[in-house]
Amino acid sequence: MDIINNNHRDENDDDEEEALSAMSSVPPPRKIHSYSHQLRATGQKGHHRQRQHSLDDIPKITEIVSGCGISGDSSDDEFYPYATTTNSSSFPFTGGDTGDSDDYLHQPEIGEDFQPLPEFVGSGGGVGMFKVPTRSPLHSARPPCLELRPHPLKETQVGRFLRNIACTETQLWAGQESGVRFWNFDDAFEPGCGLSGRVQRGDEDAAPFQESASTSPTTCLMVDNGNRLVWSGHKDGKIRSWKMDYVLDDGDDSPFKEGLAWQAHKGPVNSVIMSSYGDLWSCSEGGVIKIWTWESMEKSLSLRLEEKHMAALLVERSGIDLRAQVTVNGTCNISSSEVKCLLADNVRSKVWAAQLQTFSLWDGRTKELLKVFNSEGQTENRVDMPLGQDQPAAEDEMKAKIASTSKKEKPHGFLQRSRNAIMGAADAVRRVATRGGGAYEDAKRTEAMVLAGDGMIWTGCTNGLLIQWDGNGNRLQDFRHHQCAVLCFCTFGERIYIGYVSGHIQIIDLEGNLIAGWVAHNNAVIKMAAADGYIFSLATHGGIRGWPVISPGPLDGIIRSELAEKERTYAQTDSVRILTGSWNVGQGKASHDALMSWLGSVASDVGILVVGLQEVEMGAGFLAMSAAKESVGGNEGSTIGQYWIDTIGKTLDEKAVFERMGSRQLAGLLISLWVRKNLRTHVGDIDVAAVPCGFGRAIGNKGGVGLRIRVFDRIMCFINCHLAAHLEAVNRRNADFDHIYKTMSFTRSSNAHNAPAAGVSTGSHTTKSANNANVNTEETKQDLAEADMVVFFGDFNYRLFGISYDEARDFVSQRSFDWLREKDQLRAEMKAGRVFQGMREAIITFPPTYKFERHRPGLGGYDSGEKKRIPAWCDRVIFRDTRTSPESECSLDCPVVASIMLYDACMDVTESDHKPVRCKFHVKIEHVDRSVRRQEFGRIIKTNEKVRALLNDLRYVPETIVSSNSIVLQNQDTFVLRITNKCVKENAVFRILCEGQSTVREDEDTLELHPLGSFGFPRWLEVMPAAGTIKPDSSVEVSVHHEEFHTLEEFVDGIPQNWWCEDTRDKEAILVVNVQGGCSTETVCHRVHVRHCFSAKNLRIDSNPSNSKSQSLKKNEGDSNSKSSKKSDGDSNSKSSKKSDGDSNSKSSKKSDGDSNSKSSKKSDGDSNSKSSKKSDGDSNSKSSKKSDGDSNSKSSKKSDGDSCSKSQKKSDGDTNSKSQKKGDGDSSSKSHKKNDGDSSSKSHKKNDGDSSSKSHKKSDGDSSSKSHKKSEGDSSSKSHKKNDGDSSSSYKSQSGKKNSNSSTVEESRNNHNKR
């Protein structure tokens, strides 16, 4: 047809003539006389009787219908039904070809076979917005995905919409409006339960899942892997916990129940996170942020089920309100606006809180407010201002200007003064809007935050802006790769995934460069989570899809080709009959008989019925009121419109047979849709739209109203139009259609949940706004262009041209409709490709439907008044499906193929000046069984060798080493843990967690670890940075620091008072360093034991503010435990130490600076507890130490660097255990050792680098323990200590995975050396 040769009007005429010739070989008899003069005569009644045509002359549909198909009557043999040249006639429909026995698929009145009506195709299709959407078994523009939960019909989700998702290692949890649910990844590829299953509607094709008992709507989720819990925040202000490892008994379908639950906030809980120390943070309205420490929750979680109420009460009372803490004298440093989301910066142990225009940065350990800043990165000094505080000032300013102007001379005229006043007022209002935010500020509102793999923080705004921040809240750079609002983030390795309100997902790298992007859903992406090698995305409609982390890439092509080969296993064909009816009612009302004649008589076999009415109401006041309501979003319709819907519903036996799905009214335009109840499970997602075209595109006397539905997972749009009137207004009608087609945007109907109810922000997110003029064409493709089937019907007002009133009536009386069609404006415009481009209409075989005199039956009722309007086919039905050529057959590539069974007008209805028109379609629909395709997807993932090879590549983890696996800390020690990436090609991503902590008891051999929330760190331990990336062949240094969390007032007789009893004992924590590649699914773990040695027995509180633990301390830096040490660098514990810098605990100390505990202290700076202390810096616990740096445990050591434990050692590097060793490198234990670099244990040690424990140690650098220690830097414990700076103890200070040996035999030294 004309789709192929749409520029050749002559060929189109030939095609139609050829089709018409198929009806009969004998042309219809032409009458040789004309009735034109008789029509003009009004005085002779005989002529009227001769020209009086009634409906008896036109066969009714019941007379046309026969048992084997549609056939014509001899009185109208010019228009036999025939085989059209379109594909719609290429297949005769039989009721059994679909395998479905529903009643609506059969038509006992018409029979199983039918002959489609011939069609006329307009030119101009196939290009631009009139191009048929591309369809295929798999979407060609996005990667193949795991459809964990296929798109459910939103009518099935009322009260059950999914709002958010979160992933554990083995499960995906989803929060919904009635509780929570979870999927096990082991069951991800299992088939759904189907329509006859035990699940509710909407989840028939979803993978098997478990659902909780009903709760208040879930607003946020957070996973606590440390305690195998999932925490959820709810709309009622409660926080609930759920066990991950909940196992149901076989056959037990009872919903699982919550664990701990308490009232956290008065309003909804917007976000819940765990800090680096296991504390639970939550936020709500009014700028409220609360904290529940892990200690309080742990106690409540340990209580029995019958003590559930007591547990909730304990937690609820233990909450810390941060807003109250930062409020001084009624002034608060943070804004009172709603806190939208929280982010745990586990790299630096901080917490971010995002509000509308500001951020607040908190210390996760001390819970102190660190900084408040806005989206531009500027520090906010005064945030909590009452709403509208600036507005009165601006108003006063405006009034002052006006008043001052009135008091002065008025040199200008009245108009000029009025103009100045108006401009001044506008300027003041503009400034108020700027201060208050306005549309510009609203566009920059923060919607989501995420912590990237390299430790940077990213935020997304409503205008699509992506902002990168460092850990201190400094704005680094910003990007914009998409014009729509950012709703969510997700990170995996070195990739950042972004979800937009438009349904797009984009991937960027850590530098902000765009890697890939695709349309993931046809609704907004409101949440994403990563697990099991997939990035799972949740759309507004509740569908969940899993995208392989390797996508886009070679994997996509393999899976796509494999699934395409199995197309017939998951493709299903169904069919449905759709009846559309259009009637311009002219502000009248219809009788029951008229509605039965129009709709009821032909609705017995249809599954979907769509009715469009025009001119329901047309009063000027009503039109103005309707326009005002539309401007503020009111679309509830009018009383008369509701009357029509109810009346038609009664005609269709609405309660028993049909179900009303939706409606939309725009002034005088009304559209409504009904679905047969046995088809109801396959039809839904009703959306509505309206486009006014009258009086400057503002009034609804002309325009269009539309309904969009999903039928067997295919989109269909029905648009009821009333275009511009008058014979000469052809161009205006074309422009009206073009405007409707381009601007019609569907939204949820009034009886469905709005977008914010499903988690979408209420900001301005439209993709067709004028503010988004820069959006590319692909992103703003028209809703109608994306539909699989589009049906336009209504009063199009196209007239007959080039023909007189009398001639038109003459042709009508002769039933020469072929001559009249040549004069049809709409057909001419469609041929020229100026309107309804590429769309089709059945060839008209009924008389013109306009204009008639009311209540005058028959063709004699045409307008005979003064104007004598020429009869015309104003009321039409035009459509398109997914066919791109006449030869296209129904398949997944061409999923909707429609043919017309009936197209006529009800000429016996006389209640209006228009006759109602109806068109019945038979639509074949090819769709996908999502459950079966998910099984095929899983089979390919598990069995295809190429796919397995690509997935195995994702398991590669760069080789990394950790410098130590054992650390000992005491008295604010700091140990540097070095993580090295030995791979020379790929980056390594690491994260450090705490597997648990335990109290060390002498009577126990094994430690019982107690994990904190989300594997948080104990409060005495500070690890920084706890996450980040390591470049190839590089290393990163991690500071592991012991931190005391006490003040002097908490000490009584040297014993801390506010700790638990076990806190006075030694503690041990196990750090886990998780390492993965930039895009790897596997993780390598390194475990590091960290022990905290508590020495409370030696603690005393002195009046001196310093906290030194040495008697004599001089410039000691490090941790020394030696009697004599010189220039030792490490951890020394000596009786005599000079110039030691560290932590000393000696009897004599001079110039101590830090934390010293000695009997003598002079000029000490810090907290000292010593008798004599001079210039000591640190916490020393040595008797004599000089310039010792490190941790030495030797009696005499010089220039030792490392961990030595020898009596005499020189230049030894290694691990020696001999009495005399020179230039050894390692860990030596000899009596004589000089220049030892390693771990030595000798009585005499010179230039020892390591951890030495010798009686004579000079210039030792490391961890030395000697009686004489000079220039030691570390932690010394000696009786004489000068210039001590560091942290020293007399027993055991800082070790890194090694134990000091104190043996003096040569054999043991050689054995240790050989081991090195």
Swiss-Prot record:
Q: What happens when the gene is disrupted?
A: Precocious pollen germination within anthers. Hypersensitivity to abscisic acid (ABA) during seed germination. Elevated levels of Ins(1,4,5)P3 and cytosolic Ca(2+).
The record's region (Catalytic 1) falls at 788-804
* Region Disordered, annotated ranges: 1-53, 752-772, 1100-1316
GO molecular function terms noted in the UniProt entry = inositol-1,4,5-trisphosphate 5-phosphatase activity; metal ion binding
Stretches of Basic and acidic residues bias are at 1114-1286, 1307-1316
**Gene Ontology biological-process annotations:** phosphatidylinositol dephosphorylation; pollen germination
Q: Which SMART domains match?
A: IPPc, WD40
Instruction: Tell me where the cross-link Glycyl lysine isopeptide (Lys-Gly) (interchain with G-Cter in ubiquitin) is found.
Output: 946
Q: What keywords appear on the UniProt entry?
A: Hydrolase, Isopeptide bond, Magnesium, Metal-binding, Repeat, Ubl conjugation, WD repeat
Task: Name any one Pfam family assigned in the record.
Answer: Beta-prop_IP5PC_F
Q: Where are the WD repeats?
A: 153-193, 213-252, 264-302, 441-480, 520-557
Tissue/organ expression: Mostly expressed in leaves and flowers and only weakly expressed in roots, stem and young seedlings. More precisely detected in cotyledon tips, hydathodes of leaves and mature pollen grains.
Q: Which CDD domains does UniProt cross-reference here?
A: INPP5c (cd09074)
Report the induction information. Not induced by stresses.
Q: Has keyword Repeat?
A: yes
Ranges for the region named Catalytic 2 are 867-882
- Give the Low complexity compositional bias ranges: 1287-1304
Which cofactors is this protein said to need? Mg(2+)
Q: Where is the composition biased (Polar residues)?
A: 761-772, 1101-1113
Which EC numbers characterise this protein's activity in its record? 3.1.3.56
**Record's keyword annotation contains Nucleus:** no
Query: Which reaction(s) are listed as its catalytic activity?
Result: 1D-myo-inositol 1,4,5-trisphosphate + H2O = 1D-myo-inositol 1,4-bisphosphate + phosphate
Question: What is the stated purpose of this protein?
Answer: Has phosphatase activity toward Ins(1,4,5)P3. Controls Ins(1,4,5)P3/Ca(2+) levels that is crucial for maintaining pollen dormancy and regulating early germination of pollen.
Q: Name the family.
A: Belongs to the inositol polyphosphate 5-phosphatase family.
UniProt name for this protein: Type I inositol polyphosphate 5-phosphatase 12
- Please tell me the species this chain comes from: Arabidopsis thaliana
Gene (name only): IP5P12
